[in-house]
Amino acid sequence: MEVGVLSMRYAKAMIEYAQEKGVEDRLYNEFFTLSHSFRVQPGLREVLDNPVVSVKDKLALICTAADGNGESSREFVRFITLVLRNRREGYLQFISLMYLDLYRKLKHIGVGKLITAVPVDKETENRIRSAAAHILHAQMELDTVIDPSIEGGFIFDINDYRLDASIATQLKRVKQQFIDKNRRIV
C-alpha cells in the first residue's frame, strides 16, 4: 500500500476519534512534538524499524519522543499501540505529519515560514502573522529562520506559496540576464 494512502487513513481515523473524545488539541501537540523529534533525531526512525527492539520499548521511545518527560495521553498511547501491533511503525512519521495537516485544515490554521538574513523583532513578526492571518482568514503558525546566505531581504513561505524578496535571488536574476544577453551577442 502507498505511504500517503496508508498514512492518511490512520491520521483521518485518529482525528475523527480525537474529535469524538474532545482531545484533538492535546493530540496535535503530541504529534507535533513527535514529528519534530523525527526531524531532529534521524536515529529514531532506525530504532523503530529495527526488529530486535521490542514493542514495549518502541512504545516507550515514541511516548518519550512525543512528550519528553510528560505523560502521554491515553488516546495517543492506544493509537501508537495499534500502529505497533499492525507493524506500521515505519509509517509513523508520515502519519504524524498527516495528522498535523488534517488538524490544521479542521481548525483553519495556516503555516508560514519567514526566512531572513538577520533576526526580526517580535513586533514585525506579529505584524506579518496578523497580515497573513487576515489574508487567509485563518490563524497562523509562523516559524522564523535566520539564514545569512540570502544576504538581505526575506523569503516568506505560506502554505504552498513562496514570496522571495531576497538579495541573493535578485542578484541571481541579474546575473542570468547578463548571461542571456551575452549569448545573443555571440
Curated annotation (Swiss-Prot):
Q: Which GO terms describe its biological process?
A: proton motive force-driven ATP synthesis
Q: What is this protein called?
A: ATP synthase subunit delta
Similarity comment: family membership: Belongs to the ATPase delta chain family.
Q: Which UniProt keywords apply?
A: ATP synthesis, Cell inner membrane, Cell membrane, CF(1), Hydrogen ion transport, Ion transport, Membrane, Transport
- Could you name the Gene Ontology cellular component terms for this entry? plasma membrane; proton-transporting ATP synthase complex
Q: Which Gene3D superfamilies match?
A: N-terminal domain of the delta subunit of the F1F0-ATP synthase
Its annotated function is as follows:
F(1)F(0) ATP synthase produces ATP from ADP in the presence of a proton or sodium gradient. F-type ATPases consist of two structural domains, F(1) containing the extramembraneous catalytic core and F(0) containing the membrane proton channel, linked together by a central stalk and a peripheral stalk. During catalysis, ATP synthesis in the catalytic domain of F(1) is coupled via a rotary mechanism of the central stalk subunits to proton translocation.
User: What's one Pfam family here?
Assistant: OSCP
Q: How does it sit in the membrane?
A: Peripheral membrane protein
List localization entries.
Cell inner membrane
Q: How does it assemble?
A: F-type ATPases have 2 components, F(1) - the catalytic core - and F(0) - the membrane proton channel. F(1) has five subunits: alpha(3), beta(3), gamma(1), delta(1), epsilon(1). F(0) has three main subunits: a(1), b(2) and c(10-14). The alpha and beta chains form an alternating ring which encloses part of the gamma chain. F(1) is attached to F(0) by a central stalk formed by the gamma and epsilon chains, while a peripheral stalk is formed by the delta and b chains.
Family matches, as InterPro entries: ATP_synth_OSCP/delta_N_sf (IPR026015), ATPase_OSCP/dsu (IPR000711)
Mention one GO molecular function: proton-transporting ATP synthase activity, rotational mechanism
